Design a protein with these regions (language model features):
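Conserved, mostly hydrophobic/aromatic
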Residues: 8, 39, 47, 92, ...
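Conserved anion-binding
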Residues: 11, 19-23, 90-93, 97-171
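Glycine-rich, proline-tolerant flexible connector loops at the mouths of alpha/beta enzymes
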Residues: 46-64, 104, 165-175
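Conserved beta-strand positions in the central sheet of alpha/beta enzyme cores
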Residues: 48-51, 78, 101-102, 125, ...
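Glycine/small-residue-rich loop that forms an oxyanion/phosphate-binding "nest" at active or ligand-binding sites
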Residues: 53, 61-118
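Charged helix-capping and loop-helix junction motifs
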Residues: 60-67, 141-150, 175-183
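Catalytic cores of alpha/beta
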Residues: 73, 77-98, 180-216
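Glycine-rich phosphate-binding active-site loops on the catalytic face of alpha/beta enzymes
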Residues: 83, 94-112, 167-170, 198-202, ...
Length: 239
């Protein structure tokens, strides 16, 4: 199982939100590249980057920070937040970003998503965020009528091989992740590499996710608060 420590960017700073709420934001650092270097020193090989400004208003205000992270090297980097066009995908991939994450656009423009999956293959992942089991979009403010599991099946049929699934209720509150959900996804949507995201705050959870065949896990607030030690976690999932 791969571990993706997370860097969420707002105004070029490293921040964390609680349950996606921009009014409940904590700043953890001024220098994303320094943060990424710390992750590398702890043994990380992967990095999950979210452009929160892009997610909110579609701007590219963190483009310079993302370019610097890609240029720094040493990590497989996936980027999400505000990626709604092929032009933006091209822009990031040409920087050296390894994988782009499509979020709300996968719901609002499924045809574009299917085309991008066909064109770019494994360089595209889809982020599925669910509230009470239903797909949520636009910064989690709108909840659709489609169940997350059903949407994942549709994505798999369209050729999606990587889905980052977040249970919104768990995100940023450090009270554990929804293990039953990831077990269900693995059983009901075979052939997709699922990344668990939101609320992972113990080594026991990581081991359980690994045991059920989860492809990857994203670690955010648990690292920044010191609840989890990245070096130890990397060793744990690699053994």
């Amino acid at each position: 199982m791969n571990l993706f420590p997370a860097i969420d960017l707002r105004g070029g700073k490293v921040v964390r939100l609680t349950q996606g709420d921009y009014d409940r934001m904590t700043v953890y650092g001024e220098d994303p590249c320094a943060q990424a270097r710390q992750f590398v020193e702890a043994g990380a090989g992967y990095l999950h980057v979210v452009d929160l400004d892009g997610a909110k208003d579609g701007t590219l205000s963190n483009y310079g920070s993302i370019a610097a992270l890609a240029k720094q090297g040493g990590l497989y980097i996936e980027v999400g937040g505000g990626i709604r066009t092929e032009e933006r995908i091209e822009k990031y991939l040409s920087l050296g970003v390894d994988r782009c994450i499509l979020g709300s656009v996968a719901v609002t423009d499924f045809d574009l998503t299917a085309r991008m999956l066909k064109r770019y293959g494994e360089r595209i992942a889809v982020g599925v965020d669910a509230k009470d089991g239903f797909v949520a979009i636009h910064g989690w403010k709108e909840v659709s009528a489609e169940k997350g599991v059903d949407f994942c099946r549709r994505l798999a049929d369209a050729g999606c091989t990587a889905i980052i699934y977040t249970d919104i209720a768990c995100d940023g509150v450090m009270q554990g992740t929804n293990l039953a959900l990831y077990r269900q996804l693995a059983a009901e949507v075979p052939g997709v590499a699922f990344t668990a995201s939101g609320g992972i705050s113990s080594e026991a959870e990581l081991l359980e996710l690994k045991k059920m065949g989860t492809a990857a896990a994203i670690l955010g607030k648990s690292l920044y608060t010191g609840a989890l030690d990245l070096k130890r976690c990397v060793e744990l999932v690699q053994n």
